[in-house]
């Protein structure tokens, strides 16, 4: 079955609306977060990913937030949603850190942010842990060393060219 993006305004009923204020939120919180996300320019969401939360597929879930696939116009984006039970009161500090590393050409580009959301460039690809786990053939340790060296060089070069 082909999945399609759903307009944010239509994601107001459980179980999909539960993602806006995970793990538990009031109707008022959900409505407020939908408005907050619309103000950031996000138009639609696609619930896909290998991780499942209460029958809903997402790209990722962590201690602070949940990440889903979204769209602004025709551009796919990653949307980090602050969990209601997060020890952080907002995502402001994380947004500031992303802006700093973006100047060094590191990490996904931060497109927009608010108290409860980070809207970032969507980077499609294999998770690094899965990629490393898949390195079982001859010569893969040297391949891994080359990649790690390149990443570290890129980070260093970005730092000295500020």
Where do the protein language model's features map onto the residues?
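Conserved small/polar residues in nucleotide/adenosyl-binding loops
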Residues: 160-162
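Conserved structural core of kinase catalytic domains
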Residues: 109-144
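Conserved N-terminal boundary motif of the eukaryotic protein kinase catalytic domain
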Residues: 48-58
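A conserved alpha-helical element in kinase catalytic cores
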Residues: 80-114
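Juxta-kinase regulatory segment immediately upstream of eukaryotic protein kinase catalytic domains
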Residues: 2-50
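ATP-binding glycine-rich loop module of kinase domains
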Residues: 57-91
């Amino acid at each position: 079955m082909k999945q399609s993006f759903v307009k944010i305004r239509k994601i107001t009923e459980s179980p999909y609306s539960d993602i806006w204020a995970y793990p538990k939120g009031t109707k008022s919180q959900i409505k407020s977060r939908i408005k907050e996300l619309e103000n950031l320019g996000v138009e639609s969401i696609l619930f896909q990913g290998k991780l499942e939360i209460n029958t809903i597929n997402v790209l990722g879930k962590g201690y602070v937030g949940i990440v889903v696939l979204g769209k602004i116009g025709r551009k796919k984006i990653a949307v980090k949603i602050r969990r209601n039970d997060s020890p952080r009161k907002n995502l402001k500090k994380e947004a500031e850190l992303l802006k700093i590393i973006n100047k060094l050409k590191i990490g996904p580009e931060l497109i927009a942010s608010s108290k409860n959301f980070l809207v970032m460039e969507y980077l499609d690809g294999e998770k690094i842990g899965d990629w490393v786990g898949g390195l079982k053939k001859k010569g893969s340790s040297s391949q891994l060393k080359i990649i790690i060296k390149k990443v570290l060089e890129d980070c260093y070069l970005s730092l000295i060219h500020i």
